[in-house]
Amino acid sequence: MDNSGKTEKFQLHVPNLEELCQVLESGLNKNFSDVKVSVTDCPDLTQQPFGFPVKGLCGKPRITDVGGVPNLIPLVKLDKVYNMNSVSKEVELPGAFILGAGAISFKTAGINGELMPLVLTEAEGRSAVNASYFSSINPEDGKCLQEKYSDRFDDCDFGLLANLYACEGKPGKVIEVKACRRTGEDSLVSCMRKTMAEHYGEKSVALGGTFIIQKGKAKIHIMPREFSVCPLNTDEDVNNWLRHFEVSAPLIFQTVMISRDPGLDLRVEHTHGFSHHGEGGHYYTDTTPNTVEYLGYFLPAETVYRIDRPTETHNVGRD
């Protein structure tokens, strides 16, 4: 795994779950007409519609930001290849369950695309279980092509960048978010992140987890199969390069968000999702505010690990 830079570690503020529920509910009420946030037992995530390789989101929760957008933009750095099993060791949780948002490895796939990681990493006496999905542009019709990673590849590699939530995959108490009918401009994730930023100020609070769009549609993007040969120097350049789609519920998203970057050049939110009808990619927001219904499960992380932080950075292409 390319980890030429050292891994940096930062202890996060971990609010009481009941308190965090109140904070999130208050903020979400400004952006959705019908909101309920509560502490509940994590549902069995091995069941549908999730189909994860573990039952829960609990047990030593932590997040990591691996590589970064500067490995993709303005021009790609193809040598930046990482591995989920190695990441689990870097975040001091060998055998962790990892979910989040990243990019597939060009070295493995021979193309570029969006990765929806769902990996139970290897442990002593146990091989890794890779339940990830990936999306690319179908060369035949230019539409979204979503595939199960293990149907095509047998590794746990990824490329360029990822924002990941790692835990022991155990059942336990989590925060359940129900939000319907969006009245504000922010996406569910942006609203939650901004709400925490406003309430916790200088403290950094991070959440990881999964949410379903049960009704409605969402705007996503998928990166082209080929990397840009011309430098992508502005957000407009990036936007014109990406392929945008409207996709339909039910959609299962994995997200990592942090209220405040503690000086580690973090991507403050990143969300990818899949479906069981062949649509998936990088989430922006819903496109059906009057009918959208969200159901999500989240947990605050205790620590953030910054793996292979780019030496030269910028803020282009982080939406």
Curated annotation (Swiss-Prot):
SMART domains (UniProt xref): DUF1907 (SM01168)
Chief place of localization: nucleus
Cellular component aspect of the GO annotation: cytoplasm; nucleus
Cellular compartments annotated: Nucleus; Cytoplasm
Root EC class: hydrolase
EC number: 3.1.-.-
Molecular function, one GO term: hydrolase activity, acting on ester bonds
Residue sites binding Zn(2+) per the record: H270, H272, H282
Alphabetical UniProt keywords: Cytoplasm, Hydrolase, Metal-binding, Nucleus, Zinc
SUPFAM superfamilies in the cross-refs: AF0104/ALDC/Ptd012-like
Keyword Aminoacyl-tRNA synthetase tagged: no
Cofactor: Zn(2+)
GO aspect biological process, one term: DNA damage response
Pfam families associated with the record: DUF1907
Subunit structure comment from the entry: Monomer.
Function, in words: Exhibits ester hydrolase activity on the substrate p-nitrophenyl acetate, in vitro. May regulate DNA damage and repair by regulating HIF1A degradation via chaperone-mediated autophagy (CMA).
Protein name: Ester hydrolase C11orf54 homolog
Species, as recorded: Danio rerio
